């Protein structure tokens, strides 16, 4: 039969929508935030101490919502647990269910151990409903000893060490699923798991910078300049590696010039020209690269460094989302017969629309806000010299005290004793 009698493309549409884009995006934030926490707990990067707790709780909050996009995508979400009850030994999705459960349990235990001193202290000091909540979280513990703290520190480090490969597998398997689809040339590459993993670290570090700077701004405190600069340095290195791997993959496809390159080049230059060329490459990769080069300069003004790092992190988060979109949705836009393209427009409503996606992205932030109300998300800082401090029953400001010391130091001894002598020699009334 003549091929001209067919209408191409003959594909009904795409199967994986924006929810499948959100799923690797959220799991990437989970893995990247945990890596930052592990840099402090395992590799003793003391410069990351201000964000160590925030990174761990952020990973837990986003991990608790990571499966929501998959449940919204399923037509029968009530059957989701079947993958755990009757697993298939050769299914990567079944393996993910067990890895996700193990990682979630590890996060819960590690967060509890990190905050256990605070939980026990508040269980003893708080009353009412708040005290009941902390006593439940304390699991019967009413005091902390030096020995128990040492055991907790050892367990935290052990869990952080075990969590690094689990977090990498948790997100790397998503790239493994796409790379294993041999029928799609846009997905079938051995670099796909590595690209997904490195981009996860990029998004996690960028997300932590945005959260830390935003929370400091909301509380009216200055971000730790050394901590922000260190995270910007890690982000710059991870961004260079991620973009280099993506460009190597694309360059290899172009140099090989297989039968599929014609449709892939049309896909990139026409259908993904904005999301790939403009957003992912120019806005999300080139601009953050230049901004981070400015932010990592050692003698840069802290406010300018924080502004450059925060703006670069926001652009990187957009870049990673665009990368997920271009991989998941872009790989479904061309016909399986390489003859024509499929159009896809994201609806506003429905369980796989823009509003539902915005709600899914908001839920982890809401969980993080609740966690901030319940537990201290970063290390206690030293009292600032500009803040008033308490002496006895009076609140005194450091400025009058400093002025008094200055006057005392500059006034000659004879003049300092003159008012006292005048008071003693004055006649009593």
Regions found by a protein language model. Name each.
Residues 26-44, 54-86, 92-142, 156-159, ...:
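Transmembrane-helix bundle segments that line or gate the permeation/cavity pathway
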Residues 307-411, 415-429:
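TerminUS-proximal long segments
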Residues 1-5, 77-82, 254-263, 332-339:
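Peri-membrane helix termini and adjoining interfacial loops of integral membrane proteins
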Residues 14-25, 48-60:
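Loop-to-helix transition at the N-terminal end of transmembrane alpha-helices
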Residues 24-26, 46, 106-306, 311-312, ...:
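Long, contiguous internal "core" modules enriched in hydrophobic/ aromatic residues
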Residues 19-23, 94-97, 192-196, 258-283, ...:
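Membrane-interface transmembrane-helix boundary segments in multi-pass integral membrane proteins
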Residues 9-19, 85-92, 147-154, 183-192, ...:
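Membrane-interface segments at the starts/ends of alpha-helical transmembrane spans
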Residues 1-42, 369, 385-387, 394, ...:
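N-terminal signal-anchor module of multipass membrane proteins
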